[in-house]
Amino acid sequence: MISTGLEKLDELLGDGIKNGIITDIFGASSTGKTQLVLQIAVNSLSLGGTILYQDTTGNFRPERLLDMLKPKELDAALLDKITVGRITNMQEQFSAISKIEQSNYSLVIIDNITDLFSFEYSKEEQILEKNKQFTKYMKQLASVVFEKKIPVVAVNMIRKINDIEQENLDSVMSLFTHIKIKLSKKSTNYMGEVFPHSGENRFYYKIEKNGLTSST
């Protein structure tokens, strides 16, 4: 188990991020998605873990990890245990699955998992092909995750469809992800929800320089 750094979220997840499943973190822009996965990465590093960070957006910033390491008094040399793979097209994202299969990482982060598929299949008439290719990708990824018993955390975005907010490629994501964490902001308050979950599934948080902290 890897702690998320948020006590209530860990409780809702049954102690943290589990092995052998894909955990889906999604939400609108500026709700703390990337900060949460970086926080999970730092907690994995503190346990001696090695991490594969697949960056499809070019937004990975090691200095943000340093900001999180310092309060925990962890050595900056731990960053050497993170392998960052910059992925610039859909084919590279498919090929990157083999890196997971051939290695023994303690944690894999994919940020953002759907972005390149939406970019390369951006036209209305390409929707079916986009869903077909993304389904193929997720099926291959899920198979490796199950076989290797590796925890994978995927970041995804929200899009507006007919003025309704919906997770990007939700119909496919829901087939292959086991836990969903939705992050949202209302006014100045941040809230997360965990699915599926019976009973109360919400947690509240603040975004700070050194990561996400619990809020009431």
Named regions from a protein language model:
Residues 85, 111, 183:
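Conserved residues at the C-terminal ends of beta-strands
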Residues 4-16:
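Pre-Walker A adenine-sensing motif
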Residues 18-95, 99:
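Conserved P-loop
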Residues 143-216:
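Phosphate-binding/switch region of NTP-binding enzymes
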Residues 96-172:
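P-loop NTPase motor core
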Residues 2-6, 34, 89-90, 131-134:
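A conditional alpha-helix N-cap/helix-loop micro-motif detector
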Residues 93-103, 194-199:
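Short, surface-exposed amphipathic charged segments that create phosphate/polyanion-binding patches used
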